[in-house]
Amino acid sequence: ICSRNRMTYSKVTAILEGDEALCREYAHLVPMLEDMKALAEILMQKRDRRGSIDLDVREAKIVADGENIEVSAYERTISHHIIEEFMILANETVAEFLAGYELPCVYRVHEKPSEEKAAGFRAYLQELGVKADFRPENVRPGEYGKILEKLEDSELFRVVNRVMLRSMSKAKYSAENGGHFGLASRCYCHFTSPIRRYPDLVVHRLVKLAIGGQAGEAEQMAAFVARAANESSNAERRADEAERAVDELYKVWYMRSHLGEECDAVVSGVAAFGVFGLGFAVLAAVK
């Protein structure tokens, strides 16, 4: 990695918003950052045209300082969008490269929602008075995306985001290319984070073999790639469960300091034991 400048999301956002002091300090980077912003906007428009779903379900940002816990919603800024768009394009390009040469690949697959879940989501929207005329047996990503666009300035936006996400299938790793529903992508993999995600590392090794004239050796890795995809999906599920458990502990500790307080919340689900509400940047069950 040839790192010329140690930049942060907040710095880049401030520069692109015209912070005079930072623009002077990083004057040599400003033209490139402006070009990156322009390119990211083009890529976002391109994804939007093909029907990609831009979910904005804000995860909780947890900051622990001893026994003091702060929970807030992660903020997505233009700098986050730039990196997101560039990563998506890189991941698609690499997946298409390996698929084009009929070489093995650990694909990132996101299947379309099941008919049952899509029908449940449509019924939920109809109860809210939101027009939803998609066919549950063959819903397309663009139809989900249009619903979010329609509700962008509505108080229903956050909760519909959350319920829409629950109606979708969970993404997984696979040796078979099944496309990515959420991104409306025909061919997708994880390539951009090999230092922290094993599937990315496997994909890097496959690309290295392919461009190094060792495509035959890459072809022989098909069985290994299938095992790597399966094990990575299983490991991801375990990691997600552990992360949720730890986050919930922090959120409970945070809410202890707000006992007895009232806050506005949005009901995002109903169960036999109570309701789920979004408030204090926390999704909680209320009995």
Set out the residue ranges of the language-model regions.
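Electropositive polyanion-binding surfaces
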Residues: 1-282, 286-287
